[in-house]
């Protein structure tokens, strides 16, 4: 599916919620807006990696974020989250997108996600690694210290995490919602899989031949 067709399909299906589209309750209409198509997913992976390099984000982390959210498919969330990265509509105001339906554009959706994720990544404190022993994370199957990439993903999903972690005297007892802990676990697995595919491809970025390989740009 081309970028133009993806946008047109998403807008057409989302328009059933009314003229405001993404701004109205979507619980009755949530779900994927296109069939699961491996070719479309690969097309979007290429786009995601391009955006990540431009935004100074680890491409594999951004890919893993999209895989965790929607398996990199156009999607309308229960609370009207938009696109493959499930960006909340109110971010359109922060990013000065007019109209907010621009968030359905796959590239814009990925850029928004990259910037939100990068902001979360910058909020890391080394002591947050001890949250790996948090009861909720352990119950979700987490083992070992919490890493920075997963903390950023956890914050992407649960925006209050930096404030809650900063105020906690014992990170083991922070009341992380079970759904958020499970999200962090899925992201970590998706990140390992993304990096595993890269190693299998000799670290060649999606959409590039080995001769044109470029190094990934990490968050800064």
Summary of predicted features, one role per range:
Residues 16-41, 46-47, 53-55, 90-220:
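Non-catalytic cell-wall polysaccharide-engagement segments
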Residues 48, 67-93, 159-162:
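Cell-wall polysaccharide-cleaving catalytic domain and substrate-binding groove, primarily
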Residues 53-61, 65-67:
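N-terminal secretory signal peptides
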Residues 2-17:
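Sec-dependent N-terminal signal peptides of Gram-negative exported proteins
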Residues 37, 58-59, 81:
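Membrane-interface starts of transmembrane alpha-helices
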